[in-house]
Amino acid sequence: MDVREGGRGAARRGLGRAAVTVAVLWCCVVAACTSTTREGTRSAPEVRAWVTTASGSQKLSDRGPVPFSTGRSGEPDIVVENGRRYQQFFGVGASITGASAVLLDTLPDDVRSRVMRDIFQPGQGIGLSVLRQPLGGNDFSTSDFSFTPGRDEDHVLPLLTEAARLDPSLAVVLSPWSAPASMKTSGSLVGGSLRPEDAGAYADYLAGAARAYLDAGVPVRGLTVQNEPSFSPPSYAGMTLDTEQQRTLLRDHVAPALQRAGLRLHLWALDDNFDRWPDADALLSDPAKRQAVYGVAFHCYRGDVSALREIRDRHPGVAVSVSECSGGAWSDGFAHELRYEARTMLVGAVRNGAAWLVKWNLALDPQGGPTNGGCQDCRGLVTVDPSTGTVTPSPSYYAFGHVGRFVTPGARVIGATARTGSDLDTVAFRNPDGSHVLVVFNDGSSTRDVRVETGGRRFGYRLPAGALATFTW
């Protein structure tokens, strides 16, 4: 991560040993629910509303039904157009890093199970459906290491398989921070680049790791070849790759290695910050060489989210996503973080073409750790405090729940236009079952009576300033 700004029981099919746990409390304020479907997939003759306010007094709160009307008095603030269809959307997520797994394993089995249900089970909590998983050592692993089968058995793997059990639609994308030290110019996991003569061996290493996870019951669906290839971290595993190295590695080595292994995975290029989009553009510039690339993955720490649109416009048919975006101490309170997530991630990234959105650590402690030499002020989607036994959701947790709980993986982004000058940010989805999800953020300084028109019908809702709302019908 380059922020230069700013067992439990055995896994289903082994890659766990029981871990000692301490008594703690789960203090996540999420209503209990036994449904196995996402809220947005329930067809209804009326609209339902869920709201998170800027003060945090309401957090993904069910505000009950909102009636449709056929009246047309006044100009609508938002028009939802089912006929305008854009990219498929596969969900929101995070990363179960080594730090996250160790912290979650301090929880008693029943508490940890409830936390996992509230995070991953469709229709309950926030409905994460994507995990971007570090492959080997990274800035939030317990140490620097190269992947070997069995290395993740104690902590990470059992949580991955539990998440997959809770959500059968879960998709995992693997991302390495470094090639094994023996394949690098530095002879170390820290620093250096990939030796050209070891590109084939590295590709086989990646394919072997993906196969090992799949055999252990982890639903691996995608792969990047290098986390932040433009950045060489000084104190933890990392590796630089220039554009030509990435292109050659993807096309000539990784794609063939996956094919030989019988693996059909999406290959994601870049896996770096928004401001590196010209690198992705150059990587994709030769049509004959871009065939191996399914999409381009971005991080949020530098540059602007419009980078996704730059790639979509220049390279039609290439998917884009946000594969890492940490919260941290730089956020100025609940309202500030909620606004960022709503405007930049949930609305901004999706309207610019994102197929999925991922935060960074699923869980960290109150000090932003444990770390392995990287970011010292990051924050997890939830904060686990082993000393007090509390698990506290972040504002980003609730923000991501406004999409994850209601949008089914494979949904289609559809037209949603806010009236000019309305201070409303919005994005809409149509689920595979035909139900609709509308996400609206009021970026104004006062409460708004929001009028929404869709399919010849209208509904209205009084939305406080700085509030995020999800409407389903």
Model-based region annotation:
Residues D2-E39:
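Secretory targeting and sorting signals
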Residues T106-L107, A237-G238, G333-H336:
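Short, solvent-exposed loop/turn segments at secondary-structure boundaries
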Residues S321-S323:
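Active-site neighborhood of phospho(di)ester-bond hydrolases with catalytic His/Asp-centered motifs
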Residues G327-W330, D365-P366:
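Short gly/pro/ser/thr-enriched loop/turn and capping motifs at secondary-structure boundaries
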